[in-house]
């Protein structure tokens, strides 16, 4: 970094002369060091898949949950700083329950994601705080049908047919842009998602224990069991 940019590097609320917020950019770099995760829509639902890398043989594998239940028909997968992700997941759960109690209907996923994004955006413009070092993919079913959004450290949100976050994002997105098509069955979507994750691996790496979850129209959140996952590897 050039000497003249150092002052802007330390201040979260000050733009550099070329319009950059360096702390937000650094938060995005933290996401790039996280596990790869993806989401994609299929014919009557939406799917989340995450690579779950086990860093130590001493860790209980079942204790590492990358895909999180928000509501019966909404889930999220995260990549980046785990503690930051936990705070935002709890925020999303509370927001979803408040809406459900107030309106008594399916949670509007776009509104939910906007509330989480607003929370993240606030941490890019006030002194004494830092941006959340995490990105999230939200997937679920609402009144419109299957929905899929992502949200980054700046609080930017987009809706997708298929998307990815984490260290292998570029490779996964490149693969999906070539191979994804609308109208896939759930089985076809899982097969495609696993292939996309494998395309992001370094030479010599193996996809050993991915997490897979789906939500379909009329059916609640479902996490795939270990034996189900093995069939797709």
Curated annotation (Swiss-Prot):
Choose any GO biological process term that the UniProt entry carries and state it.
proteasomal protein catabolic process
Keyword flag Cytoplasm: yes
Which residue windows are transmembrane per the record? none
Annotated S-S bridges: none
Q: Name one GO cellular component term.
A: proteasome core complex, alpha-subunit complex
Q: In what way is its activity controlled?
A: The formation of the proteasomal ATPase PAN-20S proteasome complex, via the docking of the C-termini of PAN into the intersubunit pockets in the alpha-rings, triggers opening of the gate for substrate entry. Interconversion between the open-gate and close-gate conformations leads to a dynamic regulation of the 20S proteasome proteolysis activity.
Asked whether the UniProt record includes Acyltransferase among its keywords, one would answer no
**Gene3D superfamilies xref list:** Glutamine Phosphoribosylpyrophosphate, subunit 1, domain 1 (3.60.20.10)
Q: Which domain of life is it from?
A: Archaea
Q: Where in the cell is it found?
A: Cytoplasm
Family matches, as InterPro entries: Ntn_hydrolases_N, Proteasome_alpha, Proteasome_alpha-type, Proteasome_asu_arc, Proteasome_asu_N, Proteasome_sua/b
Matches recorded under CDD domains:
proteasome_alpha_archeal (cd03756)
Keywords from the UniProt entry: Cytoplasm, Proteasome
Molecular function in Gene Ontology: threonine-type endopeptidase activity
**SMART domains this protein is in?**
Proteasome_A_N
What functional role does this protein have? Component of the proteasome core, a large protease complex with broad specificity involved in protein degradation.
Looking up PANTHER family in the UniProt record yields: PROTEASOME SUBUNIT ALPHA/BETA
Q: Oligomeric state and partners?
A: The 20S proteasome core is composed of 14 alpha and 14 beta subunits that assemble into four stacked heptameric rings, resulting in a barrel-shaped structure. The two inner rings, each composed of seven catalytic beta subunits, are sandwiched by two outer rings, each composed of seven alpha subunits. The catalytic chamber with the active sites is on the inside of the barrel. Has a gated structure, the ends of the cylinder being occluded by the N-termini of the alpha-subunits. Is capped at one or both ends by the proteasome regulatory ATPase, PAN.
Q: Which family does it belong to?
A: Belongs to the peptidase T1A family.
What is the name listed in the Swiss-Prot or TrEMBL entry for this protein?
Proteasome subunit alpha
Species annotation: Thermoplasma volcanium (strain ATCC 51530 / DSM 4299 / JCM 9571 / NBRC 15438 / GSS1)
Top-level taxonomy: Archaea, Methanobacteriati, Thermoplasmatota, Thermoplasmata, Thermoplasmatales
């Amino acid at each position: 970094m050039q000497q003249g940019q150092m002052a802007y590097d330390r201040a979260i609320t000050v733009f550099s002369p070329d319009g950059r917020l360096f702390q937000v950019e650094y938060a995005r770099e933290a996401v790039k060091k996280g596990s790869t995760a993806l989401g994609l829509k299929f014919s009557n639902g939406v799917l989340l898949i995450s690579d779950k890398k086990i860093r130590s043989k001493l860790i209980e594998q079942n204790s590492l949950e990358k895909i999180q239940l928000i509501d019966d028909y909404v889930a999220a997968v995260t990549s980046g700083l785990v503690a930051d992700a936990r705070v935002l997941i709890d925020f999303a759960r509370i927001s979803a329950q408040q809406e459900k109690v107030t309106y008594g209907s399916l949670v509007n996923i776009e509104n939910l994601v906007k509330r989480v994004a607003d929370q993240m955006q606030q941490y890019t413009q006030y002194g004494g705080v830092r941006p959340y070092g995490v990105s999230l993919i939200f997937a679920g079913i609402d009144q419109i049908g299957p929905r899929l959004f992502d949200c980054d450290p700046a609080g930017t949100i987009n809706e997708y047919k298929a998307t990815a976050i984490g260290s292998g994002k570029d490779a996964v997105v490149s693969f999906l842009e070539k191979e994804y098509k609308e109208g896939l069955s759930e089985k076809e979507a899982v097969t495609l998602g696993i292939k996309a994750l494998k395309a992001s691996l370094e030479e010599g790496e193996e996809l050993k224990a991915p997490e897979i979850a789906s939500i379909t129209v009329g059916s609640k959140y479902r996490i795939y069991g270990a034996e189900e996952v093995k069939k797709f590897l």
